[in-house]
A protein has these predicted regions:
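Conserved structured catalytic cores and adjacent interaction surfaces
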Residues: 233, 242-257, 261, 328-377
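Flexible, glycine/charged-enriched surface loops at secondary-structure junctions
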Residues: 57-65, 164-167, 230-237, 267-278, ...
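Glycine- and Gly-Pro-enriched alpha-helical subdomains that act as flexible
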Residues: 74-110, 243-330, 335
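Substrate-contacting helices/loops that form the catalytic groove of nucleic-acid
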Residues: 175-210, 268-284
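Conserved small/polar residues in nucleotide/adenosyl-binding loops
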Residues: 378-384
Length: 384
């Protein structure tokens, strides 16, 4: 099959719509269930490239959670700690494979933004991954294959309409790509730039100690950013993107946005959050929304009398500003990556507030010296 008709394009008024191969060859993908749309396929194909490259670069199973053509999260398949199982609503005693851990961690970076996501897996989707996805609100999944059991589980989602796409893992796209804007065709070579440890040798700070875990996290950050709408900044810890600031017109706004998301991710570890007692049969999205509001300055929106009873079995005490500040200061070992240079040292200052100890960015600003001087104040390595 060399083309696939779509219901509509980016918007419902944009018809007709289709995906096809310019050279007339067969599409490198097969729809196993559902009827994916235009944005679904954009998410799927971008997410697949991300997880494929992440697997190649780290040697670990990788997963991504995509929304609106940018990753809400990405991660490699490190085992989940007990606190993470609790945070991410993993069923007690669930036996998790590495690829299941990768997706749970990818989705767990920003569960609010991952609502209705497109999942991408570097490896065959197994039953453990499918069982976790079964209870999450998701639009679809792309993977190089599915076990029979996993496919049957996924086909039960969305009343049988869950989108399941299988990609040919051996497919190599043409070296040139095209895009039309206002009737004008743009042509460019594909972004085949390889991200690996060889890029991490130019340490501009006095501290030259770059642990292997930090190198891995830098690679996770850079590959995640490669498939994020620019401008973008990504915070990573333990092989997991914990905050992605995508598509902002100011670099510092990217850094702040990603930092705020990283802070929220870390605050979800707080005993008060882990101890929240929800009403029976509450849906996962409602829990996620309640936690997000509980952690915000508008916490009274879920704690006010007559309101909290809809969500909580017991009214929780607020997490005070001082408690949040104290908890966030305990976050360490975070890596911050940027898809372009930091123009000012304020990005470094903001990143430090969210536990960043390692920064990776390409450099090239006329104020590089100022950015490096700011890094030197904190002595952590900063490769370029």
């Amino acid at each position: 099959m060399n083309e696939l008709e779509l219901k509509y394009g980016c918007n419902p008024n944009q018809k007709p719509a289709r995906i096809f191969m310019r050279d007339g060859s067969d599409l490198p993908l097969t729809v196993l269930n559902g009827k994916p749309g235009y944005i679904n396929f954009l998410d799927a194909l971008n997410a697949w490239q991300l997880v494929r490259e992440l697997k190649e670069a780290t040697g670990l199973p990788a997963a991504a959670s995509f929304k609106h053509v940018s990753p809400a999260g990405a991660a490699v398949g490190n085992p989940l700690r007990d606190v993470e199982r609790q945070m991410y609503f993993v069923e007690e005693g669930a036996d998790l494979s590495p690829i299941a851990c990768a997706y749970i961690r990818a989705r767990g970076a920003d569960r609010l933004c991952s609502y209705g996501d497109w999942a991408a897996l570097s490896d065959v989707c197994d039953a453990a991954t499918a069982r976790y996805l079964k209870y999450e609100v998701s639009d679809g999944i792309i993977a190089p294959g599915y076990t029979d059991e996993a496919l049957e589980i996924l086909k039960t989602k969305k009343k049988g309409n869950y989108n399941v796409v299988q990609i040919d893992p051996d497919y190599v796209p043409a070296p040139q790509e095209y895009k039309d804007a206002f009737g004008v065709t743009f042509q460019q070579g594909r972004n085949n730039f390889e991200i690996n440890e060889a890029l991490l040798t130019n340490l501009v700070t006095e501290n030259k100690d770059l642990p292997e875990a930090a190198k891995r996290d830098m690679i996770v950050a850079l590959i995640t950013l490669k498939y994020t709408q620019s401008n973008s900044v990504c915070y990573v810890k333990d092989g997991q993107a914990i905050g992605v600031g995508a598509g902002q017109q100011s670099r510092i706004h990217c850094t702040r946005l990603a930092g705020t998301k990283a802070d929220t991710w870390w605050l979800r570890h707080h005993p008060k959050v882990l101890g929240l007692q929800f009403v029976e049969n509450i849906r996962r999205p409602d829990r996620d929304n309640a936690i997000d509001v509980y952690l915000s300055d508008e916490y009274e929106d879920v704690l006010a009398e007559g309101i909290w009873q809809k969500t909580f079995a017991v009214r929780p005490d607020p997490l005070t500003a001082e408690e949040k500040k104290t908890w966030i200061t305990a976050l360490t070992g975070v890596t911050c990556g940027s898809d372009a240079f930091f123009p000012f040292g304020d990005n470094v200052e903001r990143a430090r507030k969210s536990g960043v100890q390692y920064i990776v960015e390409p450099g090239g600003s006329i104020r590089d010296d100022h950015v490096i001087e700011t890094c030197l104040l904190y002595t952590s390595p900063s490769p370029r």
